[in-house]
């Protein structure tokens, strides 16, 4: 059984800690409670766009990757319908570098037209590569709006239309950041060769002064029960025919989920 200790900062940041002295590394993972389901139907793909923008420099640090790499660390991130996840792994003696970097970009990004333009281009190319320029790439883009008629799960994480990313403005992304990125909307997990006392001390030092923000309660539309079969047939220039099926299932928190 993995032993996990918990700590809550006054600004609402939840911290989880697991001590492991079998390694000389420490991993910091931050989950923000924001995903593609929190986007407006006319501005899809923003959660994923932000995953990229978070590496474009913060208020006090112009380049995220360089200081982490100099400290012997590595990092990555991913976005889902429900959350956005960031992690860094560093040698234990350089762990404070990761705290410094993660806290600064939680505080505020270095919003600039240049960074936005670069990341928009990167995300648009990813959209084309994954969904438009390879066989079967648009399968789940077609499947999702069949499975969901009103819930925001009906569009993929990368976005419903490439134009939503192309048309994103600096004010749009600033609004999204201040709406969702805050200590009281995040969970910081720390695992590796660092004591609980040191983890608390560094969390308080680097994250404690970041003010909480007004995080509005979600009001997602409830998906009506599907009572009919749904079918779509499309023709593409692909090597072989393909059939894709999907079923609705219970919630992840239900006892039946793992059965």
Per-range role (PLM):
Residues 2, 8, 66-216:
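Charge-rich, well-structured scaffold segments of protease-associated domains
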Residues 1-25:
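N- or domain-start disorder-to-order transition segments that initiate the globular core
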Residues 35-38, 196-197, 251-254:
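Short beta-strands and strand-coil junctions in structured, solvent-facing domains, enriched
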Residues 18, 33, 89-91, 126, ...:
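Structured loops at beta-to-helix junctions and adjacent beta-edge loops in soluble globular domains
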Residues 23-25, 63, 68-70, 80-83, ...:
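Short, solvent-exposed loop/turn segments at the edges of secondary structure
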Residues 27-89, 155-158:
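M16/MPP (pitrilysin/insulinase) zinc-metallopeptidase core fold and M16-derived inactive scaffolds
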Residues 14-16, 27-31, 87-89, 187-189, ...:
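Soluble periplasmic/extracytoplasmic beta-strand elements of cell-envelope proteins
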Residues 29-31, 145, 215-259:
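His/Glu-based metal-binding/catalytic segments typifying zinc-dependent metallopeptidases
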């Amino acid at each position: 059984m993995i032993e996990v200790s918990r700590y809550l900062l006054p600004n609402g940041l939840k911290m989880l800690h697991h001590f492991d002295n079998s390694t000389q590394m420490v991993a910091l993972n931050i989950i923000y409670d924001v995903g593609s389901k929190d986007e407006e139907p006319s501005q899809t793909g923003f959660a994923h766009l932000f995953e990229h923008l978070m590496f474009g420099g913060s208020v006090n640090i112009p380049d995220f990757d360089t200081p982490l790499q100099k400290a012997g660390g590595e990092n990555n991130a991913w976005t889902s319908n429900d959350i956005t996840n960031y992690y860094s792994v560093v040698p234990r003696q350089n762990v404070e570098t990761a705290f410094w970097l993660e806290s600064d970009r939680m505080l505020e990004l270095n919003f600039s037209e240049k960074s936005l333009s670069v990341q928009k281009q990167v995300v648009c190319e990813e959209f084309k590569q994954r969904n438009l320029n390879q066989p079967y790439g648009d399968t789940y883009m077609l499947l999702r709006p069949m499975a969901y008629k009103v819930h925001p799960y009906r569009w993929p994480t990368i976005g419903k239309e490439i134009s939503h990313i192309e048309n994103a403005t600096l004010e749009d992304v600033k609004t999204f950041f201040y709406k969702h990125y805050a200590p009281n909307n995040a969970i910081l997990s720390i695992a590796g060769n660092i004591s609980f006392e040191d983890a608390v001390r560094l969390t308080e030092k680097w994250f404690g002064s970041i003010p909480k923000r007004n995080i509005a309660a979600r009001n997602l539309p409830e998906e009506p029960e599907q009572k009919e079969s749904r079918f779509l047939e499309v023709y593409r220039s692909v090597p072989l025919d393909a059939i894709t099926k999907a079923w609705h299932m219970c919630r992840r928190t239900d006892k039946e989920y793992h059965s």
